[in-house]
Amino acid sequence: MEASTVYYTDFRCPVGTSLTDKLRRLCIAAGIKNIDMEGKFVAIKMHFGELGNLAYLRPNYAKVVADLCKEQGGMPFLTDCNTLYPGSRKNALEHLTCAQLNGFWPMTTGCQVIIADGLRGTDEVEVPVPNGEYCKTAKIGRAIMDADIFISLSHFKGHESTGFGGAIKNIGMGCGSRAGKMEQHASGHPAVQEDLCRGCHRCAKECGSDAISYNEKNKAVIDQDKCKGCGRCIGACNFDAIYALCDSANEMLDRKMAEYAAAVCHDRPTFHISLVQDISPNCDCHGENDAPILPDIGMFASFDPVALDQACADACLNAAPLPNSQLGQNLATPGWNCHHDNFKDSNPNIEWKATLEQAEKVGMGTRAYTLKKD
């Protein structure tokens, strides 16, 4: 496959310019105006940040992208899907409140926010995975698949399970419904935390496989042989008593995530933007953000999310670690087994290259790229 073009700009701003100006110019240089958006719904997929985390992308960046879409006649909306774990984004009401508290609402972003998989995280579409090896279909939030055009706006940072979180993670994991996230993280089966179960029987009413019964203490019990892994019981429980069995090894998670991302992007116009700044060691899903492991690097954009992630990863690998950080502390530890890899030296139990390998294998894009500085 021919190398893809990735466009890049740094964060330097002479007097009279701004970062939002630079992002706008970058998107235009990378070709966003070549997409026919007239009268079309445009999903702008991003992460609104968990409450307490301050490393997520500012809403000002989202407004730049939304304004460009509207200038081209598009109807943009910001979107994300509900989380699998308990937190401030596990259902649409709390998710919208979290987004608003973190600054995402029409006055700041220029468009509406829609939680793509609905109130309980169960409003999904099963989408075929092109050339899928680990997943034949992907469970994707309905509003994302209803959009005519898909744009990812990603905060590129470290990640404790996948090495880094960039475009592919934002798309693959982020667009999965709660059941889709469970399939990626696990064998696809949930379990019950008995002390949280209230015995309300709501989960059993939602189960289409007759897999849930109740023990002598009126606590839910899931028959794993009957369970189909649809995840509706997780959405049904108001008390966070049902959770996913996170038994997938990190490499399997990486590969499933890449296949989910390929399903989202297949057969429609897409465009991808990543900002490599506030490079925290872990996911923005945390309710905190540790000190950045690397200095701010720049903004990247491309039609190819695989090339985009590879370019961002390479830039991070070539950056100097910051001393007062998880990465810097690890490297300064006597006897540390240095991997000469900023992601792996920050979180040693990861295999980040598997994501890019699988994404390329299923035809989502190429790791080969040409970098053009705007």
Regions flagged by a language model, labelled:
Residues 66-67:
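Terminal amphipathic helices with adjacent charged low-complexity linkers/tails
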Residues 2-61, 71-80, 85-374:
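Extended, low-polarity segments enriched in aliphatic/aromatic residues
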